[in-house]
Regions:
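Phosphate/NTP-binding elements of NTP-utilizing enzymes
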Residues: 2-299, 304-305, 311-413, 417, ...
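Nucleic-acid-processing active sites and adjacent nucleic-acid-binding tracks
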Residues: 149, 380-410, 421-488
Length: 488
């Protein structure tokens, strides 16, 4: 039986507290409830409110946690995005105050579960008055891994084991740092499948949350992206992301207004600088539409103007969204390091360049993999596989051009001639077309083997410019005065 606070001296106080247990669930959006009720610990005795304007990309994933059309929410992102604070701690606070129900939180190890309970949750509860007064006053009801509340709801903080995932039913289950879980939990299967089984009793009100930075290697080195939002083939959280509706984070360009993804592919200005600190300070994000440069000081403003788009959707410059979105029972979100609120571009670029230098110096990929996974927020492709893919990438870039024609984009052509002697004397001619930015095409390649001189039998003799200067005249007729048609 739930205990009532012993400090009450009047029957009306007892009745008021008992009556509060029968209140219907609050109708606040989850993010608004977190902003209103959760105090975020900033140290042992310092706290402040949760500020959605710092991490606006968390609002949609957080609010989706109460959407009945989804069975699960999957969030993929680098470290320093505020995902644990908002999605895990915030969801716990929302459940305690607005919609009480049993909840299971699974950390990657028993040690991390204990640490999360003691250093994050205990401080959050202590600094959040509305949470603190709902905790059961009984010492037997609260320990590191189990917490009971006055309304009878129960919070379990566990780790990946079949014992934790068996028997009990929970309306809410949260798996944090998922890619550091074992792929097979005690021989019973993956953690997501085991966890989601715990919520099925509650039907559409049950919800499973998974959040993590990528931590598994790409399994198919020959994979080619089938869509702008598709993740590479990996196990772990990106596999769950691909099952979902595949939402990516977009910014509006401050120059042209078009929406684009703030991802590492669009970072520029930091290569070829031996000073990694200066390189990080010079880093800018480039809009792929107008090639306008965005300074790091604009990140917070653009995050607050950003939107999530599902695969199949497109945002116009005026903010209108068109297209047919991908449908799924899983709402999945993926963002990369350039948009992370608590990591600067200077820090990100410095870590990347230092890790690449360490790889070049030692051949070890461990630091580089950690940076790609946790700072950039991408799955890692081993460098050995990258080298193997270079020929495939070149093949993908091949353009259909008719033979012996000048391709579109050529501004001028150049002829080079190599003189070959010996028994097989000849001129080797190559015609190369040059375009903008150093782009070039091979237009034609051929040999000039025969001169205009004839043997007593009337047969053409091989060229021999060293002995017969008139053989050089062949370059006028067969090279300089020769023409090639345009491809279009």
């Amino acid at each position: 039986m739930n205990q009532v606070n012993e400090s009450h001296s009047r029957a009306s106080d007892i009745w008021r507290e008992v009556a509060s247990l029968f209140r219907p669930p609050g109708r606040l959006p989850v993010a608004e409830a977190i902003r209103r009720y959760m105090r975020v610990p900033r140290g042992a005795n310092i706290s402040g409110p949760w500020e959605s304007s710092l991490t606006p990309y968390m609002i949609d994933p957080i609010n989706t946690l109460s959407a009945r059309e989804y069975d699960a929410v999957v969030f993929v992102g680098p470290a320093r995005t505020g995902k644990t604070e908002g999605l895990i701690d915030g969801w716990i606070v929302y459940g305690i105050i607005c919609d009480p129900a049993d909840m299971l939180v699974v950390q990657m190890t028993e040690t991390k579960a204990r640490e999360h309970s003691r250093t994050r949750l205990s401080r959050t509860f202590r600094h959040s008055p509305e949470v603190c007064r709902r905790l059961s006053p009984s010492r037997n009801d609260n320990n590191v891994h189990d917490k009971m509340f006055l309304d009878g709801s129960f919070l379990k903080i566990g780790w990946p084991s079949i014992t934790v995932f068996s028997s009990s039913d929970y309306r809410r289950v949260a798996l944090t740092d998922y890619d550091r879980f074992p792929e097979n939990v005690d021989g019973e299967g993956d953690a997501f499948t085991l966890a989601s089984k715990r919520t099925t009793t509650f039907m559409s009100s049950g919800m499973t949350l998974v959040e993590s930075s990528p931590g598994r290697d790409i399994t198919d080195t020959k994979w080619r992206c089938g869509g702008a939002h598709e993740a590479p083939p990996t196990t772990g959280i990106l596999s769950l992301y691909n099952r979902g509706d595949r939402r990516r984070w977009y910014w509006p360009c401050p120059h042209c207004g078009e929406y684009f993804q703030p991802v590492m592919d669009n970072m520029t200005g930091f290569r070829n600088n031996p000073d990694f600190v200066a390189a990080g300070q010079a880093a800018r994000l480039m809009c792929p539409h107008c090639r306008g440069l965005i300074a790091p000081e604009q990140k917070r403003e653009l995050n607050n103007r950003g939107i999530w788009l599902r695969e199949g959707e497109r945002a116009a410059a005026d903010g209108s969204i068109t297209g047919t979105p991908r449908n799924s029972r899983i709402a999945s979100f993926w963002m990369e390091g350039p948009a992370a609120a608590f990591q600067t571009w200077e820090q990100l670029i410095f870590k990347l360049l230092a890790a690449e230098e360490e790889y070049e110096r030692t051949g070890s990929e461990e630091t580089l993999k950690a940076v790609v996974n946790t700072d950039i927020g991408r799955p890692y492709l081993p460098r050995s596989a990258t080298e193997q893919r270079k020929s495939e990438l070149l093949e993908q870039r091949a353009e259909p051009v008719p033979r012996r024609c000048v391709p579109d984009g050529v501004r001028f052509i150049e002829a080079t001639v190599d003189v070959q002697g010996g028994k097989n004397r000849r001129f080797v001619v190559q015609i190369t077309g040059y375009g903008e930015q150093g782009e070039r095409w091979i237009v034609d390649r051929y040999n000039i083997r025969h001169s205009l001189r004839c043997s007593p039998n009337g047969e053409s003799l091989p060229v021999d410019p060293a002995a017969y200067p008139e053989d050089w005249d062949l370059l006028l007729t067969d090279v300089f005065h020769k023409t090639w048609p345009l491809a279009s």
